[in-house]
């Protein structure tokens, strides 16, 4: 079944100015609507490395929902566990400046509780055959608890990302049970109640190494934009993964692609540095296009062997 991804589908509405962006003023430009959401982007990124993931999610029972499923199927994603329900998708509205960075955004999250029905009915068959699990840690708490229960039952590693750190902080105890947690510099500051603005990669690497020991987090990666990413593990490894310099067109989905690369690498036997390097390549391929996801790659381009899943999982305390 490969990597199993669990989370929400969003419709992204993105506005781009045709001239210099004027904050608080009227800006002529273009507006695009695309399929998005951290988990939806993640599962398509994994599929674009020809790894045949499975997606547990919800869509609206509308034509847009059907289009989401059709596109994922075209990319060889297993969509058997996507349920169509009223108001099953979220919406993300974002405005970009001329440099491709988000200057304002607002989002409406969907109600993901129907996913619990899927986990109750099919959780055993899904988790038994999975190579690993990837989810947004800020999902409904009952969903997160069910995921970690099934992961422990079948000995599967869980990789966690975040879309709303304020909610994710309430799930902080689950991070000890994650195989690896990935977030950005600002989110790491919220997690550890500190301000990391202006920190160098070397400084943040050392801070992260200290905090994950104290918090008993197995592995953690923090992205720092153009400064790359830093990582640390509970067994004492830490380091910096430099960014790849590319022309920035649209940063949407770059973090999701990075998380996909880390998940892919650690699932299929790579070191944490090698996994970060895969994430960096996928992220760079997203930034230089207007797409939310990476282009097609072959597993061999990253030295991957999909038959060699890591399969270890920490003991959980629910």
Name these PLM-found stretches.
Residues 125-126, 173-174, 213:
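Structural alpha-helical scaffold elements that stabilize or flank donor/cofactor-binding regions
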Residues 3-4, 194, 198-318:
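Conserved phosphate-binding/catalytic region of the ribokinase-like
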Residues 84, 94-132, 137:
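Conserved phosphate-binding/catalytic loop of the ribokinase/pfkB sugar-kinase fold
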Residues 71-86:
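A glycine-rich helix N-cap at a beta->alpha junction
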Residues 132-203, 227-228:
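Conserved beta-alpha-beta core of the PfkB/ribokinase-like small-molecule kinase fold
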Residues 20-28, 184, 239-243:
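Short glycine/proline- and charge-enriched loop/turn segments
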Residues 1-74, 248, 314-318:
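Glycine-rich phosphate/adenosyl-contacting loop at the front of the ribokinase-like
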């Amino acid at each position: 079944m490969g990597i199993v991804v669990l989370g929400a589908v969003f419709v992204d509405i993105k506005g781009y100015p045709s001239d210099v962006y004027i904050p608080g003023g009227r800006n002529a430009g273009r507006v695009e609507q695309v399929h998005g959401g951290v988990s939806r982007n993640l599962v398509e990124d994994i599929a674009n490395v020809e790894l045949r993931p499975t997606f547990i999610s919800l869509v609206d029972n509308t034509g847009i929902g059907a289009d989401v499923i059709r596109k994922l199927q075209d990319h060889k994603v297993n969509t058997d566990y996507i349920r169509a329900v009223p108001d099953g998708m979220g919406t993300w509205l974002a405005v970009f400046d001329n440099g491709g960075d988000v200057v304002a955004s607002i989002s409406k999250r969907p109600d993901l509780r129907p996913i619990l029905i899927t986990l109750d009915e099919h959780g055993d068959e899904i988790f038994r055959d999975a190579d690993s699990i990837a989810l947004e840690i800020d999902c409904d708490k009952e969903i997160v608890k069910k995921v970690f229960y099934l992961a422990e039952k079948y000995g599967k590693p869980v990789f966690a990302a975040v879309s709303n750190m304020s909610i994710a902080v309430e799930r902080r105890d689950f991070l000890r049970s994650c195989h690896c947690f990935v977030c950005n510099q600002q989110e790491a500051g919220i997690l550890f109640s500190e301000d990391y603005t202006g920190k160098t990669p070397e400084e943040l690497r050392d801070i992260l190494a200290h905090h994950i020991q104290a918090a008993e987090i197995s592995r953690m990666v923090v992205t720092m934009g153009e400064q790359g990413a830093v990582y640390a593990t509970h067994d004492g490894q830490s380091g910096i993964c430099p960014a790849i310099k590319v022309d920035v067109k649209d940063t949407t989905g770059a973090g999701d692609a990075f998380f996909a690369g880390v998940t892919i690498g650690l699932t299929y036997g790579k070191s944490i540095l090698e996994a970060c390097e895969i994430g960096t390549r996928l992220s760079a391929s997203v930034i230089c296009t207007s797409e939310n996801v990476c282009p097609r790659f072959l597993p061999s381009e990253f030295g991957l062997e999909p038959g060699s899943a890591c399969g270890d999982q920490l003991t959980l305390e629910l």
